Structures are given as C-alpha cells and as structure tokens.
Amino acid sequence: MHYYRYSNAEVSCWYKYLLFSYNIVFWLAGVVFLGVGLWAWSEKGVLSDLTKVTRLHGIDPVVLVLMVGVVMFTLGFAGCVGALRENICLLKFFCGAIVLIFFLELAVAVLAFLFQDWVRDRFREFFESNIKSYRDDIDLQNLIDSLQKANQCCGAYGPEDWDLNVYFNCSGASYSREKCGVPFSCCVPDPAQKVVNTQCGYDVRIQLKSKWDEFIFTKGCIQALEGWLPRNIYIVAGVFIAISLLQIFGIFLARTLISDIEAVKAGHHF
C-alpha cells in the first residue's frame, strides 16, 4: 500500500524574483568591471603579452579591477540562474560565498584594528614597492598621483622615499631629468596656474629641506591616511554597515528560497 501526503508548500515568487533582481545588479557590475579591466589591458598591450604583468614590480590596479569583476560576475551569475531555475546547488554556492566574504571582511577589519603596527608596515612596504615601479605602469602612476593629490602627501613617510625610484634618485649614476625631484602630484598647487605644471617637482630635493614645504607636500601618505581615518570614521563605518546589511539581505533571500525549494521537493516525495 502506498501513502501520499499532499503539501501546500510552494516556492515564493516574491523571494525568487527579488533574489534575481538583487543578483542582476551584481552580474551587470561584474560585466562592467571585467570590460573596463580588459579594455585597460588592451590599451597597455598586456593582452598580447601577459608577461608584462609579472614583470611589474608593483601592483597593477587593473588586476584588482579584474579580480573584483570575476567575483561579482560569478556570484551574480550563480544567484540569477539559481533563482530562476530554482537550482539548490547554485543557490548554496552563492549563499556560502557571500557568507565567506562577509566573515573575511569582518576578520580583516578586526585584525587591522588589533594589529595596527603590522598593517602600517605592510602598507609602507606596499607603497615603497609601487614607488619603484611608478614609471613602469600608467595605471599605477595615476593611482599614486591620485592618492598623493587627494591627501596632500608625498611618498610613504616623506619626499625622500622617491629616492627609491630610479628616475627620481639623487645618485650620481642617474642621468634622468627628474633626478632629485618628485612627481608633480607632490607639488603644492598654485591657484594662479590653470594648467597643471608636470615639471614642478624637478630638482626640488636639491634644495635645503627647510624650503621643501614651500614647493611640495612634506607629509608622508601613511601619516596622511592615519589622520584621514579618524576624521571620516562615521563615513567608513556607514559604508561598512551598508555593505554588511546588503550581504545579510542576500544571504536571507538565498536561504529562504532554498528552504522553499526543499519544502516543495520534500512534498513531492510522498
């Protein structure tokens, strides 16, 4: 004798299409990041010679853009298809990945707070290694220039850090026109100049240190960032909380949809 149980369980269309809409944003953002990253690599000729990435001593910002794009594209695809096809495997992958990213972000934030000296040393090493490669990659160059201009700083701990770069080095072996100078992004802006003077940092470090602050920023970028964080702690905290809430919302939608699908499948087995 066979027994049957009729279940009223059904998959909620509300959660299903809400999760789909949530993930379509991820997917489209991932496509944009990947498109921008591949376009940037194409402009630099990296796509025709991938060894250019490994030859760069610093970090290529495009790599970070592509990594973010791959993660967002993959998660968005898994979430969209998983929701539309009611695929438990893809939904669990999406949910698990979001949970992992959430706890990684939380761990990084806690560790960065507890080990501030270690983070400061790693950032110094990172900044100095990228100073060495300043002229080797246009995207890296623009990133450093933006950082220095936005924070009115120069080098990791000061202008002398630019001695690490072969073009700005003050040694007698250097024949660069930029010898003993700094990038234009270190220069104190002149309100009277409407056009950026890209040569304003030439020969600045030949002069007495006491006169440097008349022409360039003398504060290091590590010190500038350490001062920036307390002033903007509420903004940083607000962004972190907003991202966390979005992730928790995505996890909730995925888990709810998984439960609905499992309930429907369980009802069909009787």
Curated annotation (Swiss-Prot):
Membrane-spanning parts: 18-38, 62-82, 93-113, 233-253
Region (Necessary and sufficient for interaction with ADAM10): 114-232
Compartmental location: Cell membrane
Glycosylation sites: 169
Cytoplasmic topological intervals: 1-17, 83-92, 254-270
GO cellular component, one term: cell surface
Alphabetical keyword list: Cell membrane, Disulfide bond, Glycoprotein, Membrane, Transmembrane, Transmembrane helix
Keyword Disulfide bond appears in the UniProt entry: yes
Tagged with keyword Disulfide bond: yes
Residue intervals on the Extracellular side: 39-61, 114-232
InterPro entries: Tetraspanin/Peripherin, Tetraspanin_animals, Tetraspanin_CS, Tetraspanin_EC2_sf
One family name in Pfam for this protein: Tetraspanin
Membrane topology: Multi-pass membrane protein
GO biological process, one term: protein maturation
Disulfide bonds: 153-221, 154-186, 170-180, 187-200
Family listed: Belongs to the tetraspanin (TM4SF) family.
Complex formation: Interacts with ADAM10; the interaction promotes ADAM10 maturation and cell surface expression.
The protein's role, per its UniProt record: Part of TspanC8 subgroup, composed of 6 members that interact with the transmembrane metalloprotease ADAM10. This interaction is required for ADAM10 exit from the endoplasmic reticulum and for enzymatic maturation and trafficking to the cell surface as well as substrate specificity. Different TspanC8/ADAM10 complexes have distinct substrates. Negatively regulates ADAM10-mediated cleavage of GP6. Promotes ADAM10-mediated cleavage of CDH5.
This protein's name: Tetraspanin-14
